[in-house]
Amino acid sequence: MRRVVITGMGIYSCIGKNQDEVKDSLFQGRSGIGIDPARKEMGYFSALTGLVERPDLKKLLDRKKRHSLAEQGEYAYMATLEAFRQAQIDEEFLLDHEVGILYGNDSSAAPVIEAIDVIRAKKNTAMVGSGSIFQSMNSTITMNLSVIFHLKGINFTISGACASGSHAIGMAYLLIKSGLQDCILCGGAQEVNPYSVGSFDGLGAFSTREDEPEKASRPFDKGRDGLVPSGGGASLVLESYESAVRRGATILAEVIGYGFSSNGDHISVPNVDGPRRSLQMAINDAGIPLEEIQYINAHATSTPVGDLNEAKAIAEVFGNHRPYVTSTKSQTGHEMWMAGASEVIYSFLMMNNGFIAPNLNFEEPDEASALLNIPSRRIETEFDTFLSNSFGFGGTNSSLIIRKFKENN
């Protein structure tokens, strides 16, 4: 089995449009959450959201390519530019090699609704436009990026709810590890428009702390009252160690463990057993003692039951070993399909720069979070290995273990 390394990363989120901006936001404990006036006008119970600026692609892509990109595809494109740049992968390399793409996405709401509005108003399907179909499919990101970047390897979308981005990395890891692919672009993206979360809002799943947006997302805190939706794009370049060395690439980190499970239980209420099995599988796959995992970026979305059960699962698996545990969603909100990929990048940036961002708004633990080592202030510490959890509706669970690259690991 081959070693799987990370050679490039790109991030476009509510706390920064590139790695440098995001690293600074994490270090400062800066929130990217605010109020969306459009949601207030539409009658949403909560107008809270991660605030992500749409990129201007006019100088980067021709009109035809822009016409096929949905909002989340724009974010993914920007993240991919940064990831390929860092990996030192240019167009010539992409044309000459079979680079694959596995990307997490589980909705494309705005193009679907906009197309239906046109059909109902105009009574003419031709008025929808040629780009609509390519924007509205769940595979919109992989189909567009594969064309834009000439990707010739594996090409499909991972649709695994809020674990989509994490599973995309995990599947890329398995394919490269087994020798079926040498290099894969993977990640996740999430649209931020109001249409994408309307039904979520109707379920009462969102925090309603609109008077203090930066205090609304409060993972593990006893007073949490729901999640804050968010989005953006996160891309990573995974490749075999041999491929990276052959190219002379700088190796950033190594993926050493992937765990997954299904709860086989309630469609929206998480349990303890599924996450516990995912965690344990990742640790077994990595083949390392628990003590080597020094930090966990939890899935914790700031929901009462979800955070409670994840805390219980972590406590069961790790026992007396108490690594630092935080949820970067306290700064970003829940980036949903993107979160599993973005949180690997957030964790890497912290690991690479010797700090752990604070779990914002963690003021009082509940019965389960009291069992964990959750810092409410920034911790400046060196660590070599982290674990990232991502869970989703339908009971899909993913856990990834990443460590600093060392030649003799």
Language model segments and positions:
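Glycine-/small-residue-rich "gating" segment that lines the acyl/pantetheine channel
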Residues: 122-129, 170, 174, 191-246, ...
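Conserved beta-ketoacyl condensing-enzyme motif
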Residues: 6, 27-160, 189-197, 290-305
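Condensing-enzyme catalytic core mediating Claisen C-C bond formation in acyl metabolism
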Residues: 3-7, 30-35, 211-286, 295, ...
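ACP-dependent fatty acid/polyketide chain-elongation machinery
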Residues: 1-65, 87, 242-254, 345-360, ...
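Active-site-proximal alpha-helical scaffold in enzymes
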Residues: 76-89, 138-141, 146-149, 155-189, ...
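A glycine- and small-aliphatic-rich helix-loop capping segment at beta-alpha/alpha-beta transitions
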Residues: 20-27, 110-126, 175-178, 199-210, ...
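Acyl-CoA/ACP chain-elongation machinery
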Residues: 180-225, 258-270, 298-307, 321-372
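Conserved small-residue
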Residues: 8, 26, 80, 101, ...
